[in-house]
Amino acid sequence: MINRAQLLDTLASQAPRDFEAQALGLVPIVVETSGRGERSYDIYSRLLKERIVFMVGEVNDQTANLVVAQLLFLESENPDKDISLYINSPGGSVSAGMAIYDTMQFVKPDVSTLCMGLAASMGAFLLASGAKGKRYALPNARVMIHQPLGGARGQASDIEIQAREILYLRDRLNHLLAHHTGQDVERIARDTDRDNFMSSEDAKAYGLIDHVSTKRP
């Protein structure tokens, strides 16, 4: 088995020059030592052991599959212990986001949400969808809500079908957001007509989150 020194030497020798690590998508490695030896994890797998799930970047089918799989896995590990979903996302696909949303409501553990950086569009919707009393944002995080975006091409009848679907999704999202924030649907509709950016404190006052966290409790 490779020892700690060898592993660190290997990682150092493979370190990219000119700050290319992020561009190459390299993930930090954590080494744990136990009575049975040493074991290495990528940082996200190690945090998953602590029931922390990351949703970072665009919300798409791949993101949804990963988040849903982790939520279901953690439920199977312990159905009574909370799961933490950390969000830094500009939003994305409504259908992918709704797959995550439905799974958050479906699993037995409470899913706590925390915004770090930005939770916009579907990211903000999922932030607000966390368990009541367990929705957080860091002090300098930003939250943005708006109506779903869509574009349609083709024949007039096809465009009409797509327009009806967008209107349905807007109405559905507005009702769900009203449920999670305590705002009435009419206000949600007004406030999401255009991009609506909020500070953490504004998001708390609006009902999108419950707490602004400056320190871990």
UniProtKB/Swiss-Prot annotation:
The UniProt entry, under CDD domains, shows:
S14_ClpP_2
Annotated EC: 3.4.21.92
In terms of Pfam families, this protein maps to: CLP_protease (PF00574)
Please tell me one Gene Ontology term that the record gives under cellular component. cytoplasm
Q: Which UniProt keywords apply?
A: Cytoplasm, Hydrolase, Protease, Serine protease
Q: What SUPFAM superfamilies does the record tag this protein with?
A: ClpP/crotonase
Please list the GO terms describing molecular function: ATP-dependent peptidase activity; ATPase binding; serine-type endopeptidase activity
Subcellular compartments? Cytoplasm
Catalytic residues, per the record, are 121, 146
Q: Which reaction does it catalyse?
A: Hydrolysis of proteins to small peptides in the presence of ATP and magnesium. alpha-casein is the usual test substrate. In the absence of ATP, only oligopeptides shorter than five residues are hydrolyzed (such as succinyl-Leu-Tyr-|-NHMec, and Leu-Tyr-Leu-|-Tyr-Trp, in which cleavage of the -Tyr-|-Leu- and -Tyr-|-Trp bonds also occurs)
Q: Looking at its record, which EC class is this enzyme?
A: hydrolase
Q: Does the keyword Signal apply?
A: no
InterPro entries on file: ClpP, ClpP/crotonase-like_dom_sf, ClpP/TepA, ClpP_His_AS, ClpP_Ser_AS
Which region is the signal sequence?
none
Alphabetical GO biological process terms: protein quality control for misfolded or incompletely synthesized proteins
Q: Per its database record, what is this protein's job?
A: Cleaves peptides in various proteins in a process that requires ATP hydrolysis. Has a chymotrypsin-like activity. Plays a major role in the degradation of misfolded proteins.
Q: How does it assemble?
A: Fourteen ClpP subunits assemble into 2 heptameric rings which stack back to back to give a disk-like structure with a central cavity, resembling the structure of eukaryotic proteasomes.
Q: Which family does it belong to?
A: Belongs to the peptidase S14 family.
Q: What is the protein's name according to its record? A: ATP-dependent Clp protease proteolytic subunit
